[in-house]
Amino acid sequence: MMQGMTRSLASLGRIFGPLAIAVSLLAGAAGAGACAAGKAKIPAGTAQPDNFLYERGTEALNKKKWMTAREYFQTIVETYPQSTHRADAKLGVGDSLLGEGTAASQIQAIQEFREFLSFFPTHARADYAQYKLAMAHYYQMAKPERDQTETREAIREFDIFFERYPNSKLRPEAEKFDRETRDRLSESEYRVGLFYHRARWYPGAIDRFQQVLKNDPKFTNRDAVYFYLSEALVKMNRPAEAVPQLTKLVEEFEVSEFLDDAHKLLTEIKNAPVQPASTPKADGEKEKQKPEAEKPKPAKQDPAVTVKPKTNP
């Protein structure tokens, strides 16, 4: 069959050119999509067709036959509104879309899980739907140097999960992925701060690093934030503020590539000469407290020179 299709496409290309091949391929894809969107067939005489469909859909889902599974589940949702499997079938549709792993299917999965939570808010598997909704955004997260919109959406959905379902059995798994999600966002902010640090724009670096620690105090790679924040503070002549950051690095991390440098920087700060603190004073008070030798003195007159008063001619 494939050989025949190849020969046909080759013939089209010779006669009508590349455009004919493109049109033929698009038509074939559309036809395949239409077949996939059709309803699943039920053997004649099946006593409980919804049970049959759900079992076949679950079997296909476990075998990662995403489109086949979706056909079975979608048929239940659309044809058997009173079925006890309808809610689970709705989740099955979402799972099959997530399984495909394309950007388009993940967007569709988000819609399916949102609809489930809207139609079945008190269902026993509502926590599962909320968890999968967060994961649908998680799978779309960009690299740290790219836009983090999906990362923020994932964090928001995980927060809703923890708030609504604090005792869910899915909580440990959700916490693991939530940590990865927050690390992605914090890593993105940290890299901006590191860019400023390397460009020697220390005020901007300090602001970014402090923001990371404020928003995500459990950031996995915060040892790097502690160290570069401390360096920037020292560069800005604020060593006293660097000491607590370096101390946290040493106390919180038994293993870190920054430990040796942190100890060195701490030692340098502690051994640096102490600058006396000066307090602003009024000009008159400053003048009063100056030693006598430092005060401005009138110019001395040479005794050999006599200054005569001017007289009018």
What are these regions (language model features)?
Residues 1-35:
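Sec-dependent bacterial lipoprotein signal peptides
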